[in-house]
A protein has these predicted regions:
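A short acidic/glycine-rich loop-to-helix N-cap element
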Residues: 134-159
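Solvent-exposed, acidic/flexible segments
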Residues: 37, 41, 47, 150-157
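Short beta-strand segments enriched in hydrophobic/aromatic residues
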Residues: 132-134, 168
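Soluble periplasmic/extracytoplasmic beta-strand elements of cell-envelope proteins
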Residues: 36, 127-131
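Alpha-helical transmembrane signal-anchor/signal-peptide segments
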Residues: 26-42
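Hydrophobic membrane-insertion alpha-helices, especially the h-region
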Residues: 5-23
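Glycine-rich portal/gate segments that line the openings of hydrophobic small-molecule binding cavities
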Residues: 4-8, 42, 49, 53-59, ...
Length: 176
């Protein structure tokens, strides 16, 4: 009986300690990547706004077959919602310099994906930023797993921005 009490007390203290340490990790995580592109915001938004184009530049969709993607809520010929194997992606807002989409996977919290085009006065290039916002619960396993987000999402975001850069700059050179 003493051994059982010791085990229960030890597990409880360990859980409380791990939970207390996890509270040092923020509840809001933003992963962000940026690159300079020799293009106008319009040329960048042509790639980002059209969900049909995402398979061409977004590495998160490079291995997805077209028959697993369902588009809906079309406005001006461009879908506003995309479903990929149960994951829903929907445009939340499109401002002049920032576009935000919500990615919702069943059983998980929504992830905000945002793209910004930042113009520089006197420059022929813009900075394109892609960010992902994660809002975490207090659960220790969620908090500690967030430490791996940078390594799992960051390189793919860089690759995606590189693809956008190539496509937007290629569009620009084909017009000149």
């Amino acid at each position: 009986m003493r051994l059982f009490k010791l085990l229960i007390i030890s597990v409880t203290i360990l859980f409380l300690l791990v939970t207390a340490i996890s509270l040092l990790i923020p509840f809001h995580i933003r992963i962000s990547r940026a690159t300079n592109v020799l293009a106008t915001p319009t040329e960048v938004w042509q790639q980002v706004d059209d969900m049909h184009e995402w398979r061409n530049w977004n590495p998160f969709f490079s291995g997805v077959s077209p028959d697993k993607i369902n588009y809906s809520d079309t406005v001006n010929g461009k879908p506003q919602t995309m479903n990929v194997s149960g994951t829903s992606i929907q445009w939340k807002e499109m401002k002049r310099d920032e576009h935000i989409a919500i990615m919702q996977k069943p059983g998980f919290r929504p992830i905000l994906n945002g793209w910004k085009c930042i113009s520089h006065t006197g420059s022929d290039s813009i900075t394109v930023q892609w960010y992902m916002d994660f809002h975490l619960r207090w659960y220790p396993w969620e908090k500690f797993s967030s430490l791996l987000f940078e390594q799992s999402y960051g390189p793919k975001m860089e690759e995606g921005l590189g693809n956008i850069k190539k496509m937007a700059e290629a569009d620009r050179t084909s017009f000149n």
